[in-house]
Amino acid sequence: MRVLLHLPALLASLVLLQAATSVTRGPSLDLTSLSQEVGCGAPAPVVRCDPCSPYRTITGDCNNRRKPALGAANRALARWLPAEYEDGLSLPFGWTPGKTRNGFPLPLAREVSNKIVGYLNEEDVLDQNRSLLFMQWGQIVDHDLDFAPDTELGSSEYSKAQCDECCVQGDNCFPIMFPPNDPKVETQGKCMPFFRAGFVCPTPPYKSLAREQINALTSFLDASFVYSPEPSLASRLRNLSSPLGLMAINQEVSDHGLSYLPYDSKKPSPCEFINTTARVPCFLAGDSRASEHILLATSHTLFIREHNRLATELKRLNPQWGGEKLYQEARKILGAFVQIITFRDYLPIVLGDHMQKWIPPYQGYNESVDPTISNVFTFAFRFGHLEIPSTVFRLDENYQPWGPEPELPLHTLFFNTWRMVKDGGIDPLVRGLLAKKSKLMKQNKMMTGELRNKLFQPTHRIHGFDLAAINTQRCRDHGQPGYNSWRAFCDLSQPQTLEELNSVLKNKILTKKLLDLYGTPNNIDIWIGAIAEPLVERGRVGPLLACLLGKQFQQIRDGDRFWWENPGVFTEKQKDSLRKISFSRLVCDNTRITKVPRDPFRANSYPSDFVDCSAIDKLDLSPWASVKN
């Protein structure tokens, strides 16, 4: 199946101009012309599989021998429920003024953000049981599993300007309008620009299928954020100048002798725009979002160092191995690392008491299970946006404030690579991940204003986005069914009245706000409804999210032929070694940090909860040594 894949222009998303004072409506979306414009007539590429290969393909193809495209990159997201569009095919609800959904008008996405997600007292409520790494790991996993890129079609720069400056709705521009009393009206005009997500090429005559969005990534936990799901980029990310199986590293700067990611040569660079004096470019990584935030770039840096450490050690054990073998074996181990940390350490403290209900013990690969990431999962996993605190801390070797600016506002660190390269490296940031706490999601304190008003606003020269409004608008863009449809899907009650909804949410104020906005629980956008629910015992999501996340992760695991526990993927001795891996060991092996917590996802206090790196098990690679002739 061929898809339209248009990666967002990062600089365009940064340099927002003042919106014009009038709003005009463009033509209704025309799938025929859009499809012809991007060349949907071209034949789909033919994939040839090697059924005996011990390694995943970069693209995710060939995992399932019977259906090689299952879980592959650049395929449609799966629909667990049919799409719901205003016209039944492609127009999102809220597109046509005055048109209702289930008899009620939809509230503006920004109004929902202001009244439900925002809060006046900006002081965070921190999670007393989860470290900041807990939040960060969720983002790492999300960026390994899904990316539905924007599509910016039409008259190139003119089309984007119409969306950015004039709030012109049409084809792929679906601007987020501001309510009349919104404080952003004074500084940003009438709207925030919003480009609709890329879609799968429809089948002629373009009238039979609803619009389906793309997942540009593989659906497998395979560390594709390190290696890329795109063959040409995967090759660029490697150091092919020597047969050592290494990833390319930065040749211009280092972190006190340790590697940084290479710079991206793409110009203009939003990271250079942030600080025109420092002029530090964005990094090149397996995922295009690696430089969006400094903690994400820090995580990518750890993983590229670990790949090269693994490849180097494997070469020592197996001098006869060539570069391709070393690369693939290190990649295979790092993929297992992501799987193990996610299922052993992360998901149990996300799903809490619902873990065993939705993700039972592993029974082996099942080729009848479809691992494809579902459309709704791309919204369910956004619960992590509510765990992001308003500030980022940098800590010294004694886990005390580092340097003259140890505490930085979150919004100043978007596309901010210079803070890492020229102001301390990654160690102070990693210590902050280990010793500081995530934000706790509270029904009356959902998302920090740093994300709700200042997303991608690292300097005052740039207007900030609203992540909550974007998430809500994206639900409609993707044709997502409403809250109660998903409650029914998960065999949960479907509240219809204020009393019934309050019995689910257990919060009268929030319940009334939601019904005042939406009119009926049936219309509540899935992301909003899901994050509004009280948390399950010992978890960090409500019952609906536990269902959607649990179902997806079970399918990711059971439908993956290369899952680390599947017999034949690793030897028994190799699996015994892999069971000892830990994020703390990753830190010990790839930074100059010497004190780490044993359980890095829990909230930890220094020094009582920290141990020397010598107390943390190392990954024993001796089972990977080939038998000597």
What residue spans do the PLM features occupy?
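Terminal regions of secretory-pathway proteins
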Residues: 2-294, 312, 317-629
